Amino acid sequence: MDKIIFLDESYRLSSHPLIRKLEDDAFKQEVIKLLKIADFSIQDLTARRVERKEKNTILHDFDLNYAVIQEVDIDLHYLSFDENGAPTGTKTINWTMDSKGTVRMLYLATVMVDAHNKGKTIFIDEFDTAFHVSICEFLMAIMNSKRNANNQFIVTSHEIDLLDQPLRTDQIWFVNKSFKNKSELYSLFDFADLHKQRAHISYAKRYLKGE
């Protein structure tokens, strides 16, 4: 199962094993490099181990009433500017105070750096959540690059514009709910007119037209 990763909104990121790798400086620098390319303006980050007490609902002994959870707390460091646009230093924001999109991007960047050349299968539910379509396009380009030739990414999305990304037709699948409320899965590759050049077809437009 270490070759299979599921990314969803239910996992508490601060206690995720991958997030702990940000304590390693070399690993952290690779993640920051990816964040900079994605234009998130993060210059550095500080990761530190913290302990959190959690109510133990199984043990009733007074002394064993709490479990100690090891977590990682992260500060993100951004460039700051004066009113003329000149850099004045950095400002620090704890990741619990940053946007959902930034935290999610940090998580995905961590997963991608860790998965490099390891032959992993990564499932990402609601891939476009909290992301502008340009960020989704950037991430899909990385997923489909030679860097990730040994990995497989399986993502779900409601973002129609992603249909026009430079993907092979056998990489695009649709889920349709039948009148029996059963989900049916079918591939874009199964359509009969795929002898046309992929670049000449807007699948997003055709999908919206119901073609």
Q: Residue spans of the language-model regions?
A:
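Hydrophobic anchor residue at the start of the ABC signature
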Residues: 108
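C-terminal lobe/lid and adjacent interdomain/linker elements of RecA-like ASCE P-loop ATPase modules
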Residues: 118, 138-211
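The start of beta-strands in P-loop NTPase/AAA+ ATPase cores
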Residues: 91, 120-121
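Phosphate-coordinating catalytic segments in nucleotide- and nucleic-acid-processing enzymes
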Residues: 1-105
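Walker B catalytic acidic pair
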Residues: 125-127
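Conserved D-loop-proximal element of ABC-family nucleotide-binding domains
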Residues: 129-133
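Short basic/glycine-enriched coil/helix segment immediately N-terminal to the Walker B
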Residues: 112-120
